[in-house]
Amino acid sequence: MPRNGAACFKRLAHNLAIRKYLQNNIAIADSTVFQGTLYEHTVVRELSEKLLVKNLEVCGGSYDGGIDIRGKWPVDQIFKTARERFDLSAEFPKKASVNGAQFKPVRHKLDSKSPFRPLNVLVQCKAFKNAKITGKEIRESMGAFSSCVPASRRTQYVLMLSSPNMLTRDGLNVMNGLAIPLVYIRVEMLKSHQGWFDLENSGKLQNYYENEFASKFLQNCGVSQWLKFKLYQSLSQEAVSKTAGGLSGLEASNVN
């Protein structure tokens, strides 16, 4: 399915930002700081294009509290588009309970007549070349989330952890044992091609996985269908302009 002009423009804008970062920092291209920040910019591009996260800001630094990227997630845009193409069941509990925490699924807000307030997104990036994500990294992410978000506001946020590699079994178990909405996204690192970085054919979102809490929190919002059928490629000009701003249950969604 061909990508529409607005979506192309948004991707072009992000690629220009990445190229600018590369040109301004090529002298330190071998450093871990360079690779880490480049990966963060790549994750920003994929979150904006593939999940419509807006107002994305790379904030990694000494005083970031362990959070590398912040943004706003208008899940209602995904829901409206997915609902036009799929039967998103309206059967879901008034309240869900996971690991001792009770909460209302987001779908309740989507079905109400009140304007939907985008979810706050906090992202941690682990630009590991080969290492998989273990329980240790998951616990570190939980610590960063807890230090930034009061317990009373946890259902206004989604924590995302991004890495180029897969989760270990231990990492998966720890992730599903948390009482916060945590989404694991596997985004490739940019690959070299003919002496430069291949921005078009690498650095893509490969997998999206919701822990048990996030799965029930985002139940029947259409995110899995959105990614599985690449609805972001067919988004209308109007929907893209509104959202441009800057794996359910135990099943992981393959994006590409």
UniProtKB/Swiss-Prot annotation:
UniProt keyword annotations, A-Z: Mitochondrion
InterPro entries, per database record: RRG7, tRNA_endonuc-like_dom_sf
A single cellular component GO annotation: mitochondrion
Protein localization: Mitochondrion
Protein's UniProt keywords contain Mitochondrion: yes
Entry superkingdom: Eukaryota
Keyword NAD: no
A Pfam entry, by short name: RRG7
One MF annotation (Gene Ontology) recorded for this entry: nucleic acid binding
Family (UniProt): Belongs to the RRG7 family.
Name of the featured protein: Required for respiratory growth protein 7, mitochondrial
Organism: Lachancea thermotolerans (strain ATCC 56472 / CBS 6340 / NRRL Y-8284)
Top-level taxonomy: Eukaryota, Fungi, Dikarya, Ascomycota, Saccharomycotina
Gene (UniProt): RRG7
